[in-house]
Amino acid sequence: MLFLLSDLGGIMEKILEFEDVISETKDYDRNILLGNGFSMAFDEKRFDYSSLLEYSQRIPSCVKRIFNTFNTSDFEVIIKKLESSAQLLKAYDRRLTTSSRLYQEANNLRDELINRILEIHPSSQNDIEKDRIFNTLFFLSNFNKIFTLNYDCLLYWVLLNREDFLKKYPNIEIFKMDDGFRPYYNELAWKQKETQNVFYLHGALHIYKNDYGLICKPHNDGRYLMYVIKDNIYNNNYPLIVTEGSSKNKLNKILKENNKYLSYCYSKLKGIKDVLFIHGHSLDKKDKHVFEAISKNLTIKTVYISLCSKENYQEKREKADTFFAKREREKTLDVNFYNADNINIW
């Protein structure tokens, strides 16, 4: 067990070990929320989205100057800036020429983000060693429900290997992972089911709305997923993902764009109970809507947040206090940190 000294009144806080926390919570309903750190643990260089700009060759120089002006390489931040500027200009100038251009640049940048994410993926799940996938399944087997903010395909590929995992490790208890998709002709269509226990809160690259308005995912074994996604984009069946820059705009897309899948996943997060692990998330305010939903859920008793050696403990503790300190009806939420460095996720 690791100890860190807090600057707040000299209080010593325990940084717990993951295995100890799992043992202590064995009698509770355990849930997990995955952030980008989950994907970066697979390949930090590939899935550090701050580096996507380096690989983007089709962004106009005027938009790249905006990245430089705000000293950021975060696509979502610039998408937010373009959208808010367009909204302001629309109110100021009724000719709409400049605001329309900014809206278009925001959409172009969103498409570029999708293309870059596709390019940084392994070409198929066959490029990922089975042992790494099994390590991830060992980790996920500790939880009853999985929520993820990542829209890459890593989790999808991992879950496809559940049966192979059980064949090799028949004595390991792992729940039946259900993402809510069911056979529908040559696709898998999403249907609202209480048995669903895997939730892509911000959508995912493999999830799309077909020509009939159904939320679908490809009916394949994952080997050619990248080709399927690119073909879908070519046919204007774009991935269902939330790339808006601000928490407000993200929540608007989830709740106000007639998106039953995203709104259902969000509602299920608000309905979990007992224990929630937040793994691989910096607690950035861009996901404030998620943390507010957690804080308002009075059936959650304890939150465990991952902390790795590269992170600033004090900064993360202050963020956690900001999001989770205030609850309705004077209910308290117990917030603890656990050491992420000793977990073999991949």
Predicted regions and their residues:
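Short catalytic/ligand-binding loop motif for oxyanion handling, primarily in non-cytosolic enzymes
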Residues: S39-D43, L154-W157, H206-D211, K285-D287, ...
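Short, flexible loop segments at boundaries between secondary-structure elements
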Residues: K64-R65, D179-K193, I300-E318
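Short secondary-structure boundary/capping segments
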Residues: K45-E54, L160-L166, C216, A293, ...
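Extended, H/D-rich, highly charged conserved domains that either
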Residues: F70-T97, L137-N249, E257
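SIR2/sirtuin-family catalytic core signature
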Residues: L2-I32, F38-M40, Y264-W346
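A Trp-anchored, charged/polar loop motif used as the substrate-binding/catalytic surface
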Residues: E13-E19, S124-D131, D178-N186, K250-S267
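Alpha/beta-hydrolase fold catalytic core
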Residues: N236-V275, D284-K285
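Gly/serine-rich nucleotide phosphate-binding loop at the start of the catalytic core
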Residues: M1-N144, L149-W157
